[in-house]
């Protein structure tokens, strides 16, 4: 990954990272640092209102770039769900009204003809690009970024290129089949995600609470549990939370073993909203993976927590922009 991938001197790229609840936006210059960064909550926005917000942020950053005496070279946007490269449309199940949203058209309008190129890709693809550029996978050409948050996804870099698949949906790691027998609940989000995402941890804790008579620990004090509650209870030495985390480590380890055996990466980078507090379990996850994975490949891979944290996709969006510029003849 070219460490000077963000922008040439005197020019800047605009980077957008859209999540299910917020939008982060910044511009990058040749030094690879985000400038004029802002994070805006989506609040009640849905459908075209979310696209309009992205357009507003592009216009804001265009003004900031011009005020710094620079010019806009390209725009990159990371989005949840599936970004269709051919049409520029996006399917994002966590944004209402984005079943087939024409995002490229919205962003081209906001660019006002100033950007020579525009790239839209999945947040999982952006995360692995960001980590390979400025994060935990610098210098690596074969990397898997496993994102564990509300859901689960994987960004895959194979021989220096993002693996997107025939129809742009590669990396839907939440659908890894790790359990038997099949349960109908898996149809909504996938087996792995059902059990080991942030929502999965909360679901597992709630189920154990209902099965544990006489429990008086910290998890009994809340009506609706979250992964944050589970981590806090684990830190307090709660036995029930320890059971939840033990099971989660088994799922995360088995999934990593499958990814390593199939793809033979140099590095597995684990990130996402859950993996702030869960980074402490990385050694246990790697040990579990080694029980299951192909032994030669497992001996060649290293495991590391994200170094960019919540900014991984934003950095990756800058890389996407620069790649798009090169694709249309830029240097």
Regions found by a protein language model. Give the residues of each.
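Glycine-rich phosphate-binding loop and adjoining helix at the ATP-binding site
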Residues: 47-48, 52-55, 59, 63, ...
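Glycine-rich phosphate-binding/hydrolytic loop that grips phosphoryl groups
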Residues: 28, 121-132, 276-331
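Helical "lid/coupling" subdomains associated with nucleotide-phosphate turnover
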Residues: 249, 266-267, 279
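Proline-aspartate-enriched helix->loop->beta-strand connector
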Residues: 260-269
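Glycine-rich beta-strand-to-loop/alpha-helix junction loops that act as flexible
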Residues: 75-81, 270-277, 306
């Amino acid at each position: 990954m070219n460490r000077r991938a963000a922008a040439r001197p005197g020019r800047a790229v605009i980077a957008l990272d859209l999540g299910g609840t917020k939008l982060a936006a910044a511009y990058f210059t040749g030094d690879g640092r985000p400038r004029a960064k802002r994070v805006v909550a989506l609040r009640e926005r849905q459908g075209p209102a979310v696209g309009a917000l992205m357009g507003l942020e592009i216009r804001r950053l265009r003004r900031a770039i011009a005020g710094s005496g620079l010019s806009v070279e390209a725009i990159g946007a990371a989005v949840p769900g599936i970004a269709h490269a051919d049409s520029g449309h996006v399917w994002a199940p966590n944004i209402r009204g984005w079943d087939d949203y024409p995002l490229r058209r919205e962003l081209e309008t906001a660019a006002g003809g100033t950007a020579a190129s525009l790239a839209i890709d999945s947040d999982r693809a952006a995360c692995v690009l960001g980590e390979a550029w400025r994060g935990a996978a610098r210098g690596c050409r074969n990397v898997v970024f496993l994102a564990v948050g509300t859901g689960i996804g994987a960004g895959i870099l194979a021989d220096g290129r993002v693996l997107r698949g025939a129809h742009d949906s590669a990396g839907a790691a939440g659908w890894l089949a790790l359990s038997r027998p099949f349960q109908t609940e898996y149809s909504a989000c996938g087996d792995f995600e059902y059990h080991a995402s942030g929502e999965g941890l909360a679901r597992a804790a709630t189920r154990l609470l209902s099965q544990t008579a006489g429990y008086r620990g910290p998890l009994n004090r809340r009506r609706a549990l979250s992964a944050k509650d589970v981590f806090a209870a684990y830190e307090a030495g709660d036995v029930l939370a320890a059971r939840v985390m033990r099971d989660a480590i088994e799922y995360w380890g088995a999934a990593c073993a499958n990814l390593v055996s199939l793809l033979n990466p140099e590095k597995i980078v684990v990130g996402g909203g859950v993996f702030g507090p869960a980074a402490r379990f990385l050694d246990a996850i790697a040990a579990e993976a080694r029980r299951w994975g192909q032994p030669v490949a497992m001996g060649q891979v290293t495991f590391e927590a994200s170094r960019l944290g919540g900014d991984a996709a934003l950095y990756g969006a800058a890389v996407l922009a620069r790649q798009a510029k090169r694709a249309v003849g830029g240097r």
